[in-house]
Amino acid sequence: MSRTASITRTTSETSIELMLDLDGTGNTDIATGIGFFDHMLTALGRHAMLDLIVRAEGDLHIDAHHTVEDVGIVLGQAIREALGDKRGITRFGFAATPMDEALCEAAIDLSGRGFLVFDVPFERPMLGDMDTQLVQEFFQALTANGGFALHLTRRAGHNAHHVAEAAFKAAARALRMAVEPDPRAAGAIPSTKGVL
């Protein structure tokens, strides 16, 4: 069964087209108009082993907020759609990912309930053309629309670029683990409730 999704979302603020393959090889083609965000989405796709195509046009003359948040919304929707009823998945994932002096941890539960615990402070306000506050906004939109819990924590680091990249890579590696098929639970819903 193909675990893919293709979603288009257009509002008065943004226009987004996204294609996702959960069983990809990490091939990405990202264009949001926000250089640093493109870099982070590329890292997310590569380390989650997702094939990911994103085309986004937004009201960048205001700022990057709507574009970053709306890409999170659409990517979350795509992950949820591609997972289907979640039969046979591992469900939980965890990763601790360093980048030089920075270290971030991520834990994911594909529970069907969107929840974010975000403890990733930044020591400067901007990453290129992206406000550091938008990192949390992205993950908030992603988890709410993806229907999964994510705990994301900075354990060490002071370079804002390194911290952000470690956070995205940790989330990616945890997601990769969680969506992987569990050979011991083929066809089973990984929940005592029988539904996720």
UniProtKB/Swiss-Prot annotation:
GO biological process, any: L-histidine biosynthetic process
Residue ranges crossing the lipid bilayer per the database entry: none
Gene3D superfamilies assigned: Imidazole glycerol phosphate dehydratase, domain 1
Top-level lineage group: Bacteria
UniProt-recorded Gene Ontology molecular function terms: imidazoleglycerol-phosphate dehydratase activity
GO cellular component labels: cytoplasm
Main location: cytoplasm
Reaction it catalyzes: D-erythro-1-(imidazol-4-yl)glycerol 3-phosphate = 3-(imidazol-4-yl)-2-oxopropyl phosphate + H2O
One Pfam family linked to the record: IGPD
EC annotation from Swiss-Prot or TrEMBL: 4.2.1.19
Pathway of action: Amino-acid biosynthesis; L-histidine biosynthesis; L-histidine from 5-phospho-alpha-D-ribose 1-diphosphate: step 6/9
The protein's enzyme class: lyase
InterPro entries: IGPD_sf, ImidazoleglycerolP_deHydtase, ImidazoleglycerP_deHydtase_CS, Ribosomal_Su5_D2-typ_SF
Location in or out of the cell: Cytoplasm
UniProt entry keywords in alphabetical sequence: Amino-acid biosynthesis, Cytoplasm, Histidine biosynthesis, Lyase
Family membership noted in the UniProt record: Belongs to the imidazoleglycerol-phosphate dehydratase family.
Name of this protein: Imidazoleglycerol-phosphate dehydratase
